Amino acid sequence: MKKGNKYGVHRVIEPKGVLPQPANKIDNNMDEIYDNEILIDVITLNIDSASFTQIEEQAGGDEQKIAEIMLGIVEKQGKHRNPVTGSGGMLLGIVEKIGTALEGKTDLKVGDKIATLVSLSLTPLRIDKIKAIRKDIDQVDIDGKAILFESGIYAKIPADMPEKLALSALDVAGAPAQTAKLVKPGDTVLIIGAGGKSGMLCCYEAKKRAGVTGKVIGLCHSEKSTKRLIELGFCDHVFAADATQPVAVLEKIEELTNGQMADITINNVNITDTEMTSILCTKDTGIVYFFSMATSFTKAALGAEGVGSDVTMIVGNGYTRGHAEITLELLRESDKLRKVFTELYA
């Protein structure tokens, strides 16, 4: 086997000298793997929410066109990085082959079922056939292969829950795990996109961390997700609003917090133009955590400057130590969460 680079630079075709994620094209030839790679037989792609929403809109909801767009992305780039959003997703698959340099260094063995916890935007991918598209949960079943680099992180699918349930939670594992690090007892926390997958997990974790002296406010988009979040009972206040309309949302948060605003705002939406809502609803010394892949650095930075806000803004890193374990544990802890996730995603 050829010797590979830890970060997968050996797979970059164009431009040379960059890492696989920003590369325009990477090598997705799976006939031969490098000595530090893991070959995966792919079962399901879990497309990033912002990416899938964009593809679905471009395709007008037509499944055949969604498939064509996805195949075109992979054919052109050797990976699934949405050219509009720049985001990818992650995958579920079975370990097919392990490079010789990783023998004795990894706890994986051939036949293990895993979820990759690195983005599809940097993962060499070959799609042989698209078998099923589940638009409601952003998942696509395929026949195909993928490569996990030596630096790539993963989670073994646990024995105590269905694989699609675990995959759905692991897709957004960074959000609740980062919430656990950020939220302190007594904090007022606003979660934008609270009725979605990452939003529900964050609401549960935020309430656990903020405690009885804290307050969790959930902003949802649809009537359906609002009703669901109210029934879950994780939030002190839940309301439906258009997160792209900052003034209206600001007025509502002023009312709910008696003008104190949020200590922490966590943005989980999959649409653009919600930066100012996040910033305006957060107190001057507070924190805005942008987990959304639809976030614009320019809009957030210039927007905060434009309204004289001194908030600390954090780019949502999808990885934090122990994030997979933390997130799966939430589904074990909360029967309500597990029931909803099972109904929606499993």
PLM feature segments, named:
Residues 99, 118-119, 124, 193, ...:
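Conserved "cap/hinge" positions at secondary-structure junctions
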Residues 259, 328-346:
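C-terminal capping/lid region of NAD(P)-dependent oxidoreductase domains
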Residues 14-52, 56:
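A short N-terminal beta-strand-loop micro-motif at the entrance of redox/enzyme domains
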